Each structure stands twice: as structure tokens, then as C-alpha cells.
């Protein structure tokens, strides 16, 4: 119980440091939080999902997308093992992996992750078509945003 609490505190501190542009402190605290979850075999719990998602986003911002993907793949495996690969948590991780693939210009892999996520959303939200449509829109809007960011990156590297 205490490990859970301390882990959440580190995750929250990491999030605050990230918001304030202190990436190294953010990374340090996020890693401490995740380490505690690992040490006490709590990685399968619901709390680990946003922690690892946020950590993966930070790693991607720090130009470490491979480490981010590795963390998310490990999380996806745990969710599949302890819950299933048809639950919303699994879909959320697939979506995060799709985002990282988009950011790193791995479009075909991004599509694969987004399709897996959408299939789960469609099944879970079968009675709520407006949620499905909202999620489709959200994912579709990522493509042009990433395209613009990639173009800026290419242009910036030419200067």
C-alpha cells in the first residue's frame, strides 16, 4: 500500500517537473515511481498505466522513442497477461504506441497500433457510437499535426 502511495507521489512530482520544463528531474522521479511498482510487483495495477504512459511521452520528448516503446510494450504484455488484450487499458497503450510511431515517422506501424486500439474501442463502446466517432476524429487529427511537426523538424535541420 505504501509503495503504491510513494510511487504515485513520484509520478506526480515527475509530471509537475515535466510541465515546468525540468525534464531530467521529471525523468528521475518517474523512474523512481515505476521502479517501486516493479519492486513490489504492482506493475499490473491500474495506477501503472498512466504512470508508464506519461513516462513514455517524456522519453519521446527527450528523443528516446525506443525506450518509450519498450516501456509501453512491457506494459501491454502485463495488461494482456493480468487482464486481457480486449480491454480499454490495452487500447490506451496501443494508442500511445501509435502516437510514438507517428512522431518517429513510422506510419505503417502507427496504423497497426491505432487499428488495434480502435477495434477494442468499437467492441467496448458498441452501444456508444458517439464515443467511437470522437476517438476516430481524435486519431485522424494526429496525422496532420505530426506531419507539420516532422516538416518543421526537417526544415530546422537544414539551417
Question: What name fits each language-model region?
Answer:
Residues 1, 39-44, 81-86, 123-130:
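Short coil/turn linkers that connect adjacent helices within long alpha-helical scaffolds
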Residues 61, 81, 96-103, 116-123:
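Short basic/hydrophobic patches in alpha-helices and adjacent helix-turn junctions
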Residues 34-39, 73-81, 118-122:
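Amphipathic alpha-helical segments of tetratricopeptide repeats
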Residues 4, 19-25, 39:
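Extended non-membrane alpha-helical scaffolds
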Residues 4-19, 30, 46-61, 88-99, ...:
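Conserved alpha-helical positions within TPR/SEL1-like repeat arrays
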Residues 111-159:
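C-terminal non-catalytic interaction modules
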Amino acid at each position: 500500500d505504501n509503495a503504491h502511495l510513494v510511487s504515485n507521489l513520484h509520478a506526480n512530482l515527475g509530471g509537475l517537473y515535466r510541465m515546468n520544463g525540468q525534464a531530467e528531474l521529471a525523468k528521475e522521479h518517474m523512474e523512481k515511481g515505476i521502479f517501486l511498482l516493479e519492486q513490489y510487483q504492482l506493475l499490473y495495477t491500474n495506477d501503472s498505466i498512466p504512470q508508464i504512459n506519461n513516462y513514455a511521452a517524456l522519453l519521446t520528448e527527450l528523443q528516446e522513442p525506443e525506450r518509450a516503446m519498450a516501456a509501453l510494450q512491457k506494459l501491454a504484455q502485463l495488461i494482456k497477461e493480468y487482464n486481457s488484450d480486449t480491454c480499454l487499458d490495452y487500447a490506451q497503450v496501443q494508442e500511445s504506441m501509435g502516437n510514438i510511431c507517428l512522431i518517429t515517422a513510422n506510419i505503417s506501424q502507427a496504423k497497426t497500433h491505432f487499428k488495434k486500439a480502435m477495434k477494442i474501442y468499437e467492441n467496448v463502446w458498441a452501444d456508444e457510437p458517439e464515443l467511437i466517432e470522437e476517438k476516430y476524429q481524435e486519431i485522424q487529427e494526429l496525422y496532420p499535426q505530426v506531419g507539420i511537426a516532422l516538416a518543421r523538424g526537417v526544415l530546422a535541420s537544414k539551417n
